[in-house]
Amino acid sequence: MYKKIQETASWLKERMQTSPKTAIILGTGLGQLASEISDTQEIPYSDIPNFPVSTVEGHSGKLIFGKLGGVDILAMQGRFHFYEGYNMKEVTFPVRVMYELGIKTLFVSNAAGGMNPAFKIGDIMIITDHINFFPEHPLRGKNFPTGPRFPDMHETYDVELIKMAADIAKEK
């Protein structure tokens, strides 16, 4: 698996015109944010060695390199889901490739439902912690040399980014 990650990252590096440090996974309903990215270089997932292909309707299935708010970024327009039949290694493959490309900050978006009657469509939710109930765990198997076997899950999500997102949401 690690060899495939390196192979894919190497293939992308040969084609990348920028070296972004930030990535965004555009979830359901946010694929249109891709139109806000300027100076784009788009690569369909189907062209990328070892990359899964999204089967969800409305997920375009391409990597987009470009600028958003003046910052070099990498965006995934369309992602892969466990419920599509992919295993966790395949679902997490793009994120592992991003790490090999030098991505340091990852924003993940999605559409979700909630039980709280105070929640409204379009409300922004910020995840501060999670419990993994999936039967298959992405850390299962041989450890990659890129990180610890069992990473510290204390403050899994960046406290400063959470605060920044909350402050921006309050302004809007």
Cite the ranges covered by each PLM segment.
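Metabolite-binding pocket within alpha/beta catalytic cores that recognizes anionic/polar moieties
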Residues: 1-153
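Active-site-adjacent substrate-binding region
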Residues: 158-172
